[in-house]
Amino acid sequence: MITASGGGDTGALRAPGEAPVDVRPQAAAPDEEAGPGGGPAPSRGGSFLARAALVTAALSVAGSLLGLARDQALAHFFGAGTDTDAFLVAWTVPEMAATLLIEDGLAFFLVPAFSLALAQRGRGTGRDPVRALVAASLPRMCLCFAAAALVLALAAPWVVAALAPGLPDQRLAVDCTRLTATCALSFGLAGYCSAALRAHQRYTVPATIYVVYNAAIIATLALLAARWGVRAAAAGVAVGGALMVVAQVPSLVRQLRSGRGTGGSPAPAEPPSTRLRTTVIWTVLLFALCRQSQVLIERFLASSLPGGAISHLNYAQKVAQMPMALALMLCTVTFPVLARAQAEGQTLKARDRVERDVVMAGCVVLLGAAAVIAGAHPIIQLLFERGAFTPEDTAATASVMRVYSLGLLGHTLVGALARSYFAGGRVTWAPVTAMGLGIVATAGLGVLSVGTFGVYGIAASNAIGICLTATLLLRGMGPRTVPIRIPKVVAELAGLVLAAAVATLLGALCARSLTAPVPALLACGPTVLLTFVLVGWSLRVGPLVSAVSALGPALRKLASRHDR
């Protein structure tokens, strides 16, 4: 039901008598600059993007660490048993809502829409197109979000039965689902604010939302876990979702008030195709829904396994996905820049941006995957083995995490490449088709393997399915999207994969030589990092060559300061 939040006819988003707001890219003068009155943000250079990426990375890491603390609290209070499984079925709702409404679906449509409106604002004629877009879309989207939340709450028993038919305590899962259903509204509003702020090149406030969200869940668990049980975690989701909106609204209001506009009638515009804009929304939301349906498949298959299987898979994914989240953070920062380049017809700039983003994201995620696979057991032992979380849970979760991590590069490439397909605001069914084929592969392989390999078969099916999708998306990059140089990108990614494989092997040998988790990680981490950088540098992989080249002058400068 969440897809109803954005799937209607966008012609209905216009107030009576208003001119339509086109979200398709149009050519704009390349020399447009922002005026002091709040026109489109001027073209930002690499230093601005680097600072924005650094701040966003710091806040993303803080949010991820709080996410780990949230999972630690959940493991401490409830372990990896049937109560946790019941909550994790309800947790599917905020997971899907985050993908559809914050991270992928809504952002893939709204960031290009706001980027185009900002480009039109620079012409300084007629009504402010940014305010027109907000007035046309936000009220009706709010109604859609609220309706989706209400339907989810009322349909909770059927949702739980469909997601996990083999779950022992379905009543507890229903209670948790009704509490988490509120995020269909709160996440929708948070995603709207986040997309608008990022299009204005305001990154700090949107990057704080998961810090606020996870802190709220932890606080609610601490206050209510003894009385409400695992329902306290679901209540924390509801509170955290509301706080994500509250954190962003003041900043968005300031951006809208600073916008330049004459306040007159809108300038005449070429009537856009409402059908086209509606199709754009559907392609974006269907892609995001297909991508998130991997979680539904995993939970469905794992519900028939012994108690704790869903929890082991969940904890493994939460840790393994941290490198992916950090890698895609860069793409989140540069997505508005890519959308603006597409809107202004700057194809070469868009191509270079995509190539850099894909290789850099691959570099970050493969380094993280190498560390996660090599140090899986001590990582899980250090993070979760306390309270009701037993050594057997540690061993099972670490093993699943190693298998799941094999698909991290695929997950990252899908996230990075999908932004390239949707940045222009054009209709494209390629991402949906590729994701659909990947989902079919995931489901088919999962059904065939779960009986024999259990949760490991589910994790392996996930990795294979997402890698198939990534391959199809990469092959589909061409003139209708962003015409990147595929052989060049593949060659650099292959070098990074080889570097990660060598680093994983050496890191695992170091980790296994020590039994205590902290010494094992202190030996494993630097080994993985050093090996990855040296092997990648020897293979002349771009980001690592640049990193090593920059390291020499930095060390010499530091040494000269020390000599003084």
Range-by-range predicted roles:
Residues E103-G122, L328-T347, A418:
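Helix-loop junctions and terminal segments of transmembrane helices
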Residues L154-W158, L167-C193, F389-L417:
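Alpha-helical transmembrane segments of multi-pass membrane proteins
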Residues S186-T208, L406-G436:
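Membrane-interface junctions at transmembrane-helix termini in multi-pass inner-membrane proteins
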Residues I209-R254, L437-T442, V455-G476, T527:
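Hydrophobic alpha-helical transmembrane segments
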